[in-house]
UniProtKB/Swiss-Prot annotation:
PANTHER family: ATP SYNTHASE SUBUNIT B', CHLOROPLASTIC. NCBIfam families: PRK07353.1 (NF005607). This is ATP synthase subunit b'. One of its GO terms (cellular component) is proton-transporting ATP synthase complex. InterPro entries: ATP_synth_b, ATP_synth_B-like_membr_sf, ATP_synth_b/b'su_bac/chlpt, ATP_synthase_B_chain. Keywords: ATP synthesis, CF(0), Hydrogen ion transport, Ion transport, Membrane, Thylakoid, Transmembrane, Transmembrane helix, Transport. One of its GO terms (molecular function) is proton-transporting ATP synthase activity, rotational mechanism. The gene is atpF2. Its main location: membrane. It comes from Prochlorococcus marinus (strain AS9601). F-type ATPases have 2 components, F(1) - the catalytic core - and F(0) - the membrane proton channel. F(1) has five subunits: alpha(3), beta(3), gamma(1), delta(1), epsilon(1). F(0) has four main subunits: a(1), b(1), b'(1) and c(10-14). The alpha and beta chains form an alternating ring which encloses part of the gamma chain. F(1) is attached to F(0) by a central stalk formed by the gamma and epsilon chains, while a peripheral stalk is formed by the delta, b and b' chains. It is a single-pass membrane protein. It holds the Pfam family ATP-synt_B.
Length: 153
């Protein structure tokens, strides 16, 4: 008792060493064991399951993201090839349209030239026929005049 008073501790204080100290130690160990088996292990298992679930979902999301990126790249490639094909088709259609236009224009010009030439030949023919007729009428008229003059004398 003198030793405890020497350090300033009184009986029944915080640092009393008696039979309650080992009992308290056993209670702490028992409480730790009970809490560990009844609370911490199930909570730890739930946390581990949740971590596995989250980890699996993250891995699955990464896989899906990589698949989406691959599909996006494929679709962009297909889109680019479709655009190129569309441009090629439009270009071919424009070329074909120009070709048909030029052919139609050439055909129309040829028909117009043929029609113009036919009209020119017809006009020349009619002009020649009119000259011949006029020449014949002039000959007939001059013969008539000559015959009248001869008959009058």
């Amino acid at each position: 008792m003198l030793a405890f008073n020497f350090f300033g501790a009184t009986e029944g204080g915080l640092f009393d060493i008696n039979a309650t100290l080992p009992l308290m130690a056993i209670q702490v160990v028992a409480l730790t064991y009970i809490l560990n088996s009844l609370f911490f292990k199930p909570v730890g298992n739930v946390v581990e399951k949740r971590e596995k679930f989250v980890s699996n979902n993250i891995i699955e999301a990464k896989n899906k993201l990589s698949e989406v990126k691959k599909l996006e790249a494929d679709l962009l490639t297909q889109l680019q090839s479709a655009r190129t094909e569309a441009q090629r088709i439009v270009s071919e259609a424009e070329n074909e349209s120009d070709k048909l236009y030029k052919e139609a224009l050439e055909l129309a010009n040829n028909e117009a030239n043929a029609s113009k030439e036919k009209a020119r030949l017809e006009i020349e023919s009619q002009t020649s026929a009119a000259r011949d007729q006029l020449s014949k009428q002039a000959d007939d008229l001059s013969e008539l005049i000559v015959n009248r003059l001869i008959l009058e004398k």
